[in-house]
A protein has these predicted regions:
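Residues forming the flavin
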Residues: 1-121, 125-240
């Protein structure tokens, strides 16, 4: 999310995963499972965009019931931050929009209204049956982790029936490190001659990536703890 007036983006993890919202492209069509991990979701955005799918940016749609009870990005639920308390600069089609009907919302944001209405009909039907026939949202254990167990039959799907309706714009982004300090198997930082620099250790995201590709959320935590342990062993000379 690109928040007006903020230099840094906002990572969407929980908000797009909980029930009561769905995400569409310019044509008003869904293109991915919103409740899956953020890496796979953004990968879908890139893959579909390369095929000509206008899904970058994409648009998270939710209704007043969702707005009342759940936060969305920096926007707190309406019970804590009513619309009157939302910064005026946030009300911009490039970030946050509101309208009494889906048709009006689509016009404000620039989404195909017919496609959006058809998508909402499908999402509402899936929320009744508990089965997302398009992208299997809620079938996976990861999906359900951020779902709401009080919502039945699928903790990741809830109908959108109460206006006004809202739209939050989502952009693909990159979260990680490029480059970093080179270390050896004792977590010692190496110089340009691949020799350890005395007294200098590093671990985690400040070092060169150990893996050629990011396999999923939290994958840097294990190496960070392991090399922190190895650094402590080398510093203390302990054999444990």
């Amino acid at each position: 999310m690109n928040i007006p007036g903020h230099e840094k983006g906002w990572l969407s993890i929980v908000d797009k995963s909980v029930p009561g919202n769905y995400t569409v492209n310019k044509n008003g069509h869904r293109f991915s499972n919103e409740s899956q991990n953020y890496v796979s979701f953004v990968t879908d955005m890139f893959d579909e965009y390369e095929k000509g799918n206008p899904c970058a940016p994409c648009y998270m749609i939710f209704d007043s019931n969702f707005r009342k009870n759940r936060p969305c990005g920096p926007l707190l639920q309406a019970s804590m931050q009513p619309d009157s308390r939302v910064p005026k600069e946030w009300w911009d089609p490039s970030f946050l929009s509101k309208a009494d009907t889906l048709e009006e919302l689509a016009e404000i944001v620039g989404i195909d209204a017919k496609g959006l209405i058809k998508t909402q009909v499908k999402v509402n039907e899936y929320s009744k049956t508990g089965k997302d026939l398009d992208f299997q949202r809620g079938d996976d254990a990861y999906d359900r982790y951020y779902g709401d167990p009080s919502v039945k039959p699928n903790p990741c799907l809830a109908p959108l029936n109460e206006g006004p309706y809202y739209c939050m714009v989502l952009y693909p982004g990159e979260m990680g490190t490029a480059g970093g300090l080179v270390i050896d198997t004792h977590a010692r930082v190496l110089d340009i001659y691949n020799q350890p620099i005395k007294g200098l250790y590093a671990c985690g995201n400040c070092t060169t990536a150990l893996l050629p590709k990011y396999p999923g959320p939290g994958s840097t935590l294990g190496p960070a703890m392991t090399f922190g342990y190895l650094a402590a062993k080398d510093i203390t000379g302990a054999n444990f």
